[in-house]
Amino acid sequence: MTIWVDADACPNVIKEILYRAAERMQMPLVLVANQSLRVPPSRFIRTLRVAAGFDVADNEIVRQCEAGDLVITADIPLAAEAIEKGAAALNPRGERYTPATIRERLTMRDFMDTLRASGIQTGGPDSLSQRDRQAFAAELEKWWLKVQRSRG
């Protein structure tokens, strides 16, 4: 099992949580980005640099992730594709995507895209709060406990 990170848009504070978790869990952590990233030295942490371009990193994560892996992303279509492959998906605010919730999120995303295309300013998400960081760490821990139980 591997934790895949859509690293170009992932907040640094979330990456720091993931670095510590990868060491503690002894779990491979792969940060996929179209730019160079500085990561702590670790046998569990690596970066995968992809070409710049629309959805290049997302497509690489989808290509390589497998059932049982965890994908960290705020990108709804990427999360949907990861779930289709049997991976778990978690956003940096600690929201676990599920087959039941991903359809709703895709619909809302498409609606917001339509509003923006018509000239309506929709604004962006709030900045990451302490509560978001705690929720992320808690959901990551829940995923890890589930992995441990499945291993016996």
From Swiss-Prot:
CDD domains the record matches: PIN_YqxD-like
Pfam families (UniProt xref): DUF188
Record-linked InterPro entries: UPF0178
Disulfide cross-links: none
NCBIfam families referenced in this protein's UniProt entry, alphabetically: PRK00124.1
Similarity annotation: Belongs to the UPF0178 family.
Protein name: UPF0178 protein YaiI
Provenance organism: Escherichia coli O81 (strain ED1a)
